[in-house]
Amino acid sequence: MESSAGDPYRRPARRTQWLLSALAHHYGLDRGVENEIVVLATGLDQYLQEVFHHLDCRGAGRLPRADFRALCAVLGLNADGETATEDANSAEAASTNPAAGMIAGGDADVREEARLALRADPPELTFRQFHARLCGYFSSRAGPRLPRGALSEHIETQIRLRRPRRRRRPGSPSLHGGAYGERVAHLEEENSSLRELVEDLRAALQSSDARCLALQVGLWKSQSDIPEAAAHELQRAQGALAEAEARARRLQRGQVEVRLRTEEARQAVRRSLHRVRELEALARRVPCLQRQVQRLEAELRGYRSEGPQLLTPQQASPRPGNRNGEPTAGGTRDSDTTPEGVQRSDSRDTDEEDEQLFRSVEGQAASEEEEEERWQEKPGRPQAHGEVPLVQPSGCVSRCDDQTAETLKASFGHCDGAEHICTLELETHVTRLGEQLQTLGTPEEEAELQQMVEAEHLRLELQMVETERVRLSLLEEKLVDVLQLLQRLRDLNISKRALGKMLLNALDRNPSQEGTCGTLAILDTLHQALVGCELLQRNPSAPASTAPAHTNPFLISC
């Protein structure tokens, strides 16, 4: 025999579980012998009818499924929980005793039947279904019923059969006279009174307990709705919080992207400004370069006009009066000295390119001087006191020609006019010098080509400068328009979210374009978006910003 702690139906019942105790007592699952339980168990059908009547507050004759489940929860008839507990107890008993394991197998079937009896599948239950489920739950668990005497069976039978209630009948005349008959009549009257009292007590207890159960079911439903509503509200709040966090993360990513693109646009504007400054510096150098090109072209034309004109040397004839005098070409030489000096003074003003050309000519002249010195050192050459008339070429405008002519005059100034060998050698040497001077035209042509190439490069750079200036002026105008529109929108109190959305849309429309063209396209798209803003269309006469234009750091002055 298990103890009362192991069997929940053998513990004394609380007042809130009189129905459970009455059902357990009726089906042999004793929860403690108490007078009120015995009284309630005598009219179990009426007890269940009172409970159903109080639960059916609408009077429709049907009990909702939620109310039946709440009643089971109040009574502690949780089939799943009890099944799990009793399964654990059965498993422990089966491990200790094989016979008890066989009994536990049968108990598992009984518990399954009890759990199925409490399962209220229909949405609403009639009294017959309500009675069948509660009684079926306990009848499936019913054990051996307690022995009852004939008097108890008679009382229960009388109570069940007495419908409606019948009060005491008027006393009949006693058949037996005497004191014994009076005593029997008195006892019967007391028994009838006791039966009526028991019936009244049972009805009152059943009605009050049914009312108490109905109130407990309502309280259970109200309390069960609160956690569900709170859980639903908490779940909804958590969903809103998650959505807000996701929106905040998207906004943060958008802000980071806007900052990055703004920084890229700022860097592009800085590069454009730096390029504009470079182009302005180049533009300031253009007039100087043009003057230099014009000067070089003038010098080149002078070289072309004077270079191929080489005068042939005059034939020297021996004159008596001229042996110790001045040479006949002295006047010509003196006349050529003045323009050569003027040209020499002009050539000193040229740049490093002219200096390189002069150094090459001086090197050639130095080599000629070395040849003249070797020619003078030949043995057996007669020395004369006369001078040989020389003709200085007028086409050479550099200092090397003067030095070469002076060297030749110093070498052959004292030669005798009668010696034709010296004259022929001098003419041959002068002719060779003329040919060498003609060969100097090749570096001059190269210099001319180089100057033409440089002039073409300068022209192309100038054209690029002009094109870049026009493009930057357009970019400046677009920037000024965008900044003015932004200032107007700021005066109209536009929201930062709407302004950021327009900027992101303008940036997203040109994702693949980079560089200056992409910046201009983005500015154009942003300008169109700002012009089409509803706030500006609703307020076309909104005042623009009164700030001066030179305070804007994005303005470009070309």
UniProtKB/Swiss-Prot annotation:
Record's keyword terms, sorted: Coiled coil
Ranges in a coiled coil: 179-304, 453-495
Residues covered by region (Disordered): 161-183, 304-395
Keyword Coiled coil: yes
Compositionally biased intervals (Basic residues): 161-170
Keyword Coiled coil assigned: yes
Domain EF-hand: 43-78
InterPro entries assigned: CCD48, EF_hand_dom
A molecular-function term among this protein's GO annotations: calcium ion binding
Superkingdom of the source species: Eukaryota
Entry-linked Pfam families: CCD48
The protein, known as: EF-hand and coiled-coil domain-containing protein 1
Organism: Mus musculus
